[in-house]
UniProtKB/Swiss-Prot annotation:
It comes from Zea mays (Maize). Residues 1-38, 99-115, 175-181 are cytoplasmic. It is found in: Cell membrane. Keywords: Cell membrane, Membrane, Transmembrane, Transmembrane helix. Homodimer and heterodimers. It is a multi-pass membrane protein. Belongs to the Casparian strip membrane proteins (CASP) family. GO terms for cellular component: membrane; plasma membrane. This is CASP-like protein 5A2.
Length: 181
């Protein structure tokens, strides 16, 4: 039987001049895209601020929002979300401008707790307003008397705000969990 056998010729490669400059194999990235102080994190904060501001503007432009407590609650939660996202976006911009890392355990814990609280509050506000919107639109069939399209748009933007906040919370929470292990 005549089978070809590959011949392996070893290459002589010079060792690196400074082996300490190379990262150890298997090291995880410290700054995941979306973490505080990264361009991805700033992008998520801008999205959160944008969705919350649109929800706030659309809901407050209707004349009937003050008569329904769930709509007032949605406005309150979007104001809270706007303040939180703007504050953290300013911190992200500062960190990017001065090239500082925000991987301090206390800072990431603060961001994670703040993101978790604002996510839950924003989600509850969007769900409450969605329930009333469905009640008005589908059950009571009162859209001729109410601006249902505005209510639905504000609720949709409230949910989009929640969905854009979730990656920030999960990345910060993962960072806290991985730093303790």
């Amino acid at each position: 039987m005549f089978a070809s056998r590959p011949v392996v010729h070893p290459l002589e490669v010079a060792a690196p001049a400074h082996p300490v400059q190379q990262p150890a194999p298997g090291v995880l990235m410290k700054d995941l895209p979306g973490m505080p102080g990264t361009p991805g994190g700033l992008g998520l904060r801008v999205l959160q601020l944008l969705f919350a501001a649109i929800s706030l503007a659309v809901m407050s432009s209707t004349a009937d929002f003050a008569s329904v407590s769930a709509f007032c609650y949605l406005i309150t939660t979007t104001v809270l979300q706007c303040v939180w996202s703007l504050t953290v976006a300013i911190v992200d911009i500062y960190a990017l401008l001065v090239k500082r890392c925000l991987r301090n355990r206390r800072a990431v814990t603060l961001f994670s707790i703040g993101d978790g609280i604002t996510w839950l509050v924003s989600l509850s506000g969007a769900c409450a307003a969605a329930g009333i919107t469905v009640l008005i639109d589908a059950d009571l069939i009162m859209c001729s008397e109410n601006p249902c399209a505005s209510f639905q748009t504000a609720v949709a933007m409230g949910f989009m705000c929640c969905f854009s906040l979730l990656p920030s919370f999960l990345l910060n929470f993962y960072s806290i969990a991985s730093s303790h292990g």
